[in-house]
Amino acid sequence: MQLSNYHSHCTFCDGRSIPEDFVRFAITHGFRAYGFSSHSPLPFETFWNMSKDDMPEYLQEINRLKQKYSDQLEIYAGLEIDYLDETYNASIPYFQELPLDYRIGSIHFLPVSERLVEENMVCIDGSFREYAHSVERHFEGDVRLLVKRFFDTTMKMIEAGGIDIVGHMDKIYMNGQKYEIFNFEEDWYRKPFEAFLDLVPEKGLMVEVNTKNWTKKKELYPRVEYLSRMREMNIPVMVNSDCHYPDLVNDGRKEAFKLLKQAGFKSTRELVKGKWQDIAL
């Protein structure tokens, strides 16, 4: 089993420990590679995103750790970058000019107005109460409309480019599945998801298998049921824990690798000495 993790949050965003604590855990548990992917700056403040002012220090600290632990662990500097709209996403010069090893593209917010401020954002990754309030207020009480907006926006993110990895690709279902009407097999969910999935290999992207909620909810993003389809499409994958605490770095990894093997995967995509390679499971 390949011990690596490329989706990780530290105290530069909403993580609960300093970067070095994650590095020490990774080394102690035999990891070969470890990547940091703090939540990128946004055009508005949130409690979980890094500020632009902190970016130089973030990059400096990750580079310091790279040098300090170079004989024990491959350490990489990444970002998890939100797609908001065509004016603010991973493809804009600010993010492309940063000296990063990789970029994860994710959807946490869906704008409901052209003005990119927090009050105009629907957060899909928070509490169900907040999610349900947004469905009522902005989507006529119909979760299907929110799902459509999510996948439409995800398609735009992929078309915009500037990313290497698609993060928690279907996390819209985390809260959405609590609605009685929610059905993964009906066309309103299945068709936009499959259209999005078809676009991933066309753009040459990797997809993470996100294990953040495996221990608590037995959920992966993408859903376990989609892994076989992704294998048939030759979509390269990696297993990431999306951890915010050092002791959760390895959460769900063993189970995810078992599920990947059952789905027919023979390898995962990994950074080896700075280059993406397929490593046998």
Locations of regions flagged by a protein language model:
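An N-terminally biased module of ancient metal coordination in phosphate/nucleic-acid-related enzymes
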Residues: 1-85, 89-97, 101, 173-187, ...
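A generic hydrophobic-segment detector
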Residues: 9, 131-141, 275-281
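Hydrophobic residues within beta-strands of alpha/beta enzymes
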Residues: 34-36, 103, 166, 207, ...
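Conserved residues at the C-terminal ends of beta-strands
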Residues: 37, 106, 169, 210, ...
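Extended substrate/RNA-proximal surfaces in nucleic-acid metabolism proteins
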Residues: 55-202
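C-terminal functional module detector
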Residues: 152-155, 160-161, 225, 257-263, ...
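Active-site-adjacent C-terminal substructures of enzyme catalytic domains
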Residues: 187-249
